[in-house]
Amino acid sequence: MSTSSNTSGECSPFSITDSIVVQATDDNADKILQEVDLSDPNIDKNDTFELRQQVSIKESPLYYLRDIPYSAYTSFQVSLIFLIVIYNGFLGPLAGNVFIPALPLLQKEFNVSETTINATVSVFMATFSISPLFWGALADKGGRKILYIISISLMVIINILLASVPKKIGSLIFLRIIQAFASSSVISLGAGTVADLTPPKDRGKAMAYFMLGPNLGPILAPIIAGLILLDNNNWRWLFGFLCIVSGLGLIMVILLLPETLRCIVGNGDRQWENWSQNENDMSTQPVDFSSPISRWSFVSDIGFLNPITQDSIFKGLYPHPPKFSVWTYLRIMTFPPVILTSIANALLFCTYYSISVTLSHFLATEYSYSNLKIGACYVCPGVCMLLGSQIGGHLSDSMRKSWKKENYNTEYPLEFRLILTVCGVLLAIGGSIGYGWCIQFHYHISAVLVFAGLMAFGLTWCNNTIMTYLSELLSLRVSSAIAVSSFFRNIAAAISSALIAKLCQKMGIGFCFLGLGLINLVSLFSILVLINNRNKWVKDSF
């Protein structure tokens, strides 16, 4: 690679030579100019996150950072980290969904109306929607692991208190609020960890794998609840079980999870800790990071950490996000791509939670099902949620890869990922409408579950794609971006769970879910507007 010398006394730490320059924002999201000799046969022109970089600092000789991988962790270590975040990602939705099959029982136990007992779901979802804004802001600056430890520890304590709560509805609602605050961290923290470890070209399926945890909540929670509620006096063990599984997650985090936030640990290579721009030591020797040494070790990285080095190259490769403020969230919330995708996702969640909350009630009253049968019926939409996320995530990455092969010198339009959501929204609309009329006319339970499954499939198909899109769009604020999206969708879920019983009474079940289905045409419109205006809105620095 030919180079040009830099003779100025003050210049950017990354001088430009006469080699071809590639902007790394396409596949890396790290704000740095990388120099690439495209004649080098070892360089994959479609894989710009692992490049041979040549960096010139002021007047000093060139230092070589060879083939820096996106992540320094081995496949086994990445799999282990994914296992931990998937498991802990399961805990939040588990806490919310294990409660739902018990609503008819708890209504009798606490001697309250259906609307009042549904309020315990509403306050949980409302808190679950707002709290990630707090966790996400800290996670993008202070680190992932310490927030996992704090939030899961709080989950353990609150579940102990819930298991012994007196039969007073006020106490139950209060503790559910605290439970929601603690458990709301796991999705934004997990999504941030996934983005730390996986490059954008693999981000869709990586997010799909992570979402196995959150999506398993709606599948396993009703079954677990049904088994626990075989004896109606055992409803307190719902929270005892949550305490046990949360404690297991906390142990895994403390013992095995490393810090992954890129502005603190970079790509996880331990060599960064002992490396800096030292001309006396490095003027004649290239610095080779192609054989990284991962920072993974037992019981490590506990606490709020500083960057492992103050070196300017490290800071250029792995920049800190701008200082957080309330205005940061307001700017993110009002950024058109974020608000449009969040509205689309929120309306889908509104419809899904209306189905989820009413299904147990209708199965008990209209079909005379036992608690165990009710729990088993939730398996169908739960499995469909898994399938929607996995198929959508893998297909999204496959379409991206095909596009890059044909346009390898062109930056991939991130909004192209959202094309897939059109199919998901249409499936969700059909599922909602079919579910309502099947209940209205008391059709066979298989028809009810098929339409509920279609709604669940369409929801996660869209949700996975939107999360992947946001993680690429706001690469320095991944947890915050996911938190904003979660805020909108969980607020919508809270409102729907609070009002759905009265809406069904006033409108009739069929017309109620017809309206909920058709309102998702707004979701479809939002996505189409974003795709058609993809060049209009330029990503700002958040």
Swiss-Prot record:
GO molecular function: amine transmembrane transporter activity
Annotated glycan sites: N6, N46, N111, N118, N274, N463
SUPFAM superfamilies (UniProt xref): MFS general substrate transporter
GO CC entries: cell periphery; plasma membrane; prospore membrane
Entry membrane topology: Multi-pass membrane protein
Source superkingdom: Eukaryota
Major localisation: membrane
Entry's transmembrane regions: 80-100, 119-139, 146-166, 169-189, 210-230, 237-257, 332-352, 374-394, 419-439, 441-461, 481-501, 511-531
Function: Plasma membrane acetic acid exporter, relieving the stress induced upon cells within hemocytes, and thus enabling increased proliferation and virulence against Galleria mellonella larvae. Confers resistance to weak acid and oxidative stress, but not to antifungal drugs.
Protein name listed in UniProt: Multidrug transporter DTR1
